[in-house]
A protein has these predicted regions:
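Core alpha/beta nucleotide-donor-binding catalytic domains of modification enzymes
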Residues: 2-211
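AMP-forming adenylation/ATP pyrophosphatase catalytic core
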Residues: 6-37, 54-57, 61, 92, ...
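Cytosolic histidine kinase catalytic core of two-component systems
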Residues: 177-178, 220, 294
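Short amphipathic alpha-helical interaction patches enriched in hydrophobic/aromatic residues
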Residues: 194, 214, 284-285
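Internal, active-site/partner-interface "lid" segment
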Residues: 197-203, 222-233
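Conserved anion/nucleotide-ligand pocket segment
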Residues: 206-225
């Protein structure tokens, strides 16, 4: 009788199958810090690469924050040498960059990691990036986004794949305890980031203080939030598809300008109008980060009033009404004033 697979291994395989994350011939860059999550991901991807006919390459970013970060780097490199896996490493002074850019270390670290993963993808002609996010990460992200203030996109949390399977997350349905048990059962000795216990980042406070409190109210809060994120993602997918259909019907997209026919636009439900505005900005700007609910509401109000020669400027985005059309434009240089 065949040995029953560990729950993490079962979920790993189910997530790949149900979301079509990996195909034969894929070349996958795996982000590996050396911690329990990424070591588990690497171990499983390495185990199944021959069976599913894909190739893996490891990318490790040393943030130079912790004293033992060089040991983490060496640990991952040794694992790759032992298993015959191509290894790339980049050392980045995250604290220095954060000071220069006046951003948080967590944000800068994430940006630098993803930038490096993209670089290795291009260098190796890889088509996918595997990230070791788990179910707990998803719950923390949902709560963090809710605290910041967010719409449906933020409440989706972390999905199994992103950008047409450019990013894949085979462990997203595994919780942290399951992953730690997998490491013990398979005699893996992952690196432990001591800063995870320090409440120096918002995410750590959510992880170490808020979630334990929520577990007193609902012991299965991690799984509950995971199910909720799936429901929200399914509903949001429908809205986004409908928004794209309506966008195609009532807008004209130019290089740095979207023109929206207000006659049809103003008849649509408010949720659809907001989705079309967000889609317009995303198509022009490449993202909708830092665009608040108030910014969207102001543009909606501008469109409803439909008074010519009125406009709103937010950073590099200008919205104005002219001749029955709402025009949303991206300016190359950032404009700080508003009308």
């Amino acid at each position: 009788m065949a040995k029953r697979l560990n729950i993490v291994e079962e979920k790993f395989l189910d997530t790949i199958k149900n979301n079509n994350l990996i195909n034969s011939g894929d070349k996958i860059v795996v982000g590996v810090s050396g911690g329990p999550d990424s070591l588990t991901l690497l171990t499983l991807l390495n185990k199944y690469k021959s069976k599913f006919n894909y190739e893996i390459i490891v990318a490790h970013v040393n943030h130079l924050i912790r004293k033992d970060s060089t040991d983490d780097e060496q640990f991952v490199e040794n694992y790759c040498k032992k298993n015959g896996i191509k290894f790339y490493c980049k050392r980045v002074n995250v604290q220095e960059i954060a000071k220069q850019q006046k951003k948080g270390e967590e944000e800068v670290g994430r940006n630098e990691r993803y930038k490096f993963f993209d670089e290795i993808c291009e260098k190796e002609n890889a088509n996918k990036i595997a990230i070791a996010h788990n179910m707990n990460d998803n719950a923390e992200t949902m709560i963090l986004n809710l605290i910041r203030g967010t719409g449906l996109n933020g409440l989706e949390g972390i999905q199994p794949s992103q950008y047409n399977n450019r990013f894949i997350r085979p462990l997203i349905n595994c919780n942290r305890n399951e992953i730690e048990d997998f490491c013990k059962e398979n005699n893996l000795e992952p690196r432990i980031d001591s800063t995870n216990k320090e409440n120096i980042y918002k995410r750590n406070i959510i992880r170490n203080k808020l979630i334990p409190f929520l577990k007193e109210l609902n012991p299965n809060i991690i799984e509950t939030l995971s199910r909720t994120s799936v429901i929200i993602a399914e509903n949001n997918e429908f809205i986004q598809k409908e928004a794209q259909k309506n966008f195609n019907k009532i807008t004209e997209l130019k290089s740095n300008l979207v023109e929206i026919d207000l006659k049809d636009f103003n008849k649509m439900p408010i949720a659809m109008r907001k989705a079309i505005i967000q889609l317009s900005i995303d198509k022009l700007n490449g993202n909708i980060r830092n665009i608040s609910k108030k910014n969207i509401d102001d543009i909606i109000k501008l469109a409803e009033n439909n008074i010519g020669n009125k406009y709103i400027i937010y950073k590099n985005i200008k919205a104005e009404v002219k001749k029955g059309k709402l025009k949303i434009q991206i300016n190359e240089r950032q404009i700080e004033n508003s009308n």
